[in-house]
Amino acid sequence: VNHFHERVRAGDDPAAVLTGLAPISRDNARTPVHWDGSEKAGFTTGEPWIALAPDHGTVHAAAQAGVPGSVFEHYRSLIALRHDDDALALGTFRLLAADHPTAWVILRQWRSPEPDETGENRVEQLLLIAQCARDDLTLTGEGGLLAALAAEGLQAGQWTEAEQVLRAGDPDVQPGSGHAGLPAVLAGWDSVLLRRRA
């Protein structure tokens, strides 16, 4: 908006400025949120400034609410976890495998300020591994991602029996669901959030 006004004040044709901005506008990669299947997708009763996606009648939040494994429910779980988990909300952040071409690996660690019933300050770690490509990602064994992370101080053996907190590719994995263990392979576009307490 600022660039547009600056160019018009400088004497440029408004239509030409808009034409020049169109290929680089962030609006090319987004549409209004589709809340429901109504004519304006529940986004507005007026006219949105950019067009709705053609599938807004079938792909929307209301169609995914309550459906295990849906993007809506996965985000709902992530938001709840952010509110309920001290390591996620308050813990230190460490990016691992920063040069990996397809994986995001994040370690969060939090130490409770108050001793527990044993007199120790509880330490909780969360490890997120997300495969951001369609190919499978090998995690364990020789040549697996965790073996490569040993150089960054991550001990793979500590995570083999960790609790699986959330798994994008498996809606049955939820906090407290009892799923444990590091998967050997993450499928394309899958992620796993693991928790261990020390």
Could you describe each region identified by the protein language model?
Residues A133-A198:
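C-terminal beta-sandwich/jelly-roll accessory domains of carbohydrate-active enzymes
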Residues V1-Q125, C132-L139, G153:
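Loop/helix patches that line or flank the sugar-binding groove of alpha-linked glycan CAZymes
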